[in-house]
Regions:
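Active-site neighborhoods and metal-handling regions in enzymes and metal-associated proteins
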Residues: 1-414
Length: 414
């Protein structure tokens, strides 16, 4: 099974990998400069972040590189206006004095030596930051932080002369609107993940367990140099729970739908795709004794709902309108109560990012370069579940672009 899956995958040629590369130095400079312009637009003095996804986005340092602890290690990005009027980022790092050399050894993507503000163990690090000359004449700088900032650090800043506000506005949009390089990586990792599902499907056999499929699929994804980070594998009635919860010992039988939702990483970017299909040993057309009429009807219904949502992924549309387009198709067919979750979410270096596509999100306005999942589903308790998930990018003109290898074509061609 494992050899068949990997061999089938590699036989595709892995074309999706041939035009993609790790983000270079100038990509990180562009991101920080875009952030600086957004800070000016939002009236913010600096964006402050500690190691995590956002730190990685702007400086290529992940939590495994520098695990957050009780001593603050903060990146402080401020806007700086050039004589020609252009705005660029000016970045400093608040770091314990004894860790300064370690911070410099991280080889962060900066064209010059990084600028540090150091503090001793017995000092107040937040006062040290406030007393640094980077603020000029500003007495109470306005700092923006995101949801990854731990509460004790946000409180430390706000109790020591800083005005701390949450993530919003143009600053939040910087990560939401992907560059073409980012889109290239997202296309590669999501197409590669879908192709791995398609390759593995051809090797499925009667009696295999959900756990065995998950393991084989993970190793298949790794064969392309990607790093899997979650699998949902459900057979038959198990798929009526959208995110599973069973022990993975269910075995595959003729007539079972297979629902697979999987994510992987490539160059720091995430895939998140789902396919629902029949195994290769189940004939097309199905034998009448299996009574799969409703399953086939729902499979197509969910695909139609996804197509309706894609038509609403246009500039200046709302997140709510995208969800409601898919939900309306499913409700009209009488399965509204069986569509139990939101339609989707944005995706990037995290699998789940804002904005979120739910029917109550009227505030989020779609902009070119935003990337979303569309993952409608119908879950008939104790019988079966169907979900189709693809990745779409909002384009300036025309319909949103599928960057996950094309949508499913039939239960035998996922």
């Amino acid at each position: 099974f494992q050899k068949c899956s990997i061999d089938t995958y590699l036989a595709t040629g892995l074309e999706f990998l041939k035009t993609v590369e790790r983000p270079p130095l100038d990509e990180y400079i562009l991101r920080r400069n875009n952030l600086a312009k957004a800070l000016v637009a939002d009236g913010i003095d600096a964006f402050v972040v500690e190691p995590g996804y956002t730190f990685s986005y702007y400086a290529n340092v992940t939590q495994p590189d520098w695990e957050p602890e009780e001593r603050p290690f903060l990146m402080v990005i401020r806007p700086s206006k050039l004589p020609n009027g252009d705005v660029i980022a000016n970045t400093s790092f608040l770091v314990p004095h004894f860790e300064e050399i370690r911070a410099r050894l991280l080889n962060m993507p900066f064209p010059e030596e990084i600028s540090t503000i150091t503090y001793e163990e017995h000092w107040n690090p937040y006062i040290t930051l406030w007393e640094s000359p980077i603020w000029g004449e500003t007495l109470s700088p306005i700092l923006m932080v995101d949801e990854e900032m731990r509460d004790f650090i946000a409180r430390g800043l706000s109790l020591n002369a800083f005005d701390v506000v949450g993530l919003s506005g143009e600053v939040e949009a910087v990560r939401q609107i992907k560059t073409e390089r980012e889109l290239g990586i997202l296309k590669a990792v999501n197409t590669g993940t879908v192709e791995a599902i398609r390759a593995m499907r051809k090797c499925l056999y009667h009696g295999v367990t959900e756990n065995e499929v998950a393991e084989v699929l993970d190793n298949t994804v790794r064969a392309a140099g990607m790093d899997p980070f979650f699998d949902i594998v459900e057979f038959g009635k198990q798929a009526a729970l959208p995110h599973g919860g069973h022990d993975g010992t269910a075995t595959l039988k003729p007539g079972d739908f297979v629902l697979i939702d999987v994510g992987a990483h490539l160059y720091g970017y995430s895939s998140d795709v789902c396919r629902t299909f029949y195994p290769p040993f189940f004939p097309n057309p199905p034998p009448p004794e299996y009574n799969v009429t409703e399953k086939l009807k729902v499979w197509q219904l969910v695909l139609d709902a996804q197509a309706a949502s894609v038509k609403q992924m246009v500039p200046n549309g709302t997140a709510s309108a995208v969800d409601l387009a898919a939900r309306g198709v499913i409700e009209a067919a009488g399965y509204g109560d069986e569509f139990t979750h939101r339609l989707g979410h944005s995706i990037g270096i995290k699998a789940h990012e804002s904005p979120y596509l739910n029917k109550g999100n009227f505030e989020a306005i779609l902009r070119p370069g935003m990337v979303f999942t569309s993952e409608p589903g119908v879950y008939v308790l104790n019988q079966f579940g169907v979900r189709h998930e693809d990745i779409l990018v909002v384009r300036e003109d025309g319909e949103a672009e599928n960057i996950s290898g094309g949508s499913a074509r039939s239960p035998w061609e996922p």
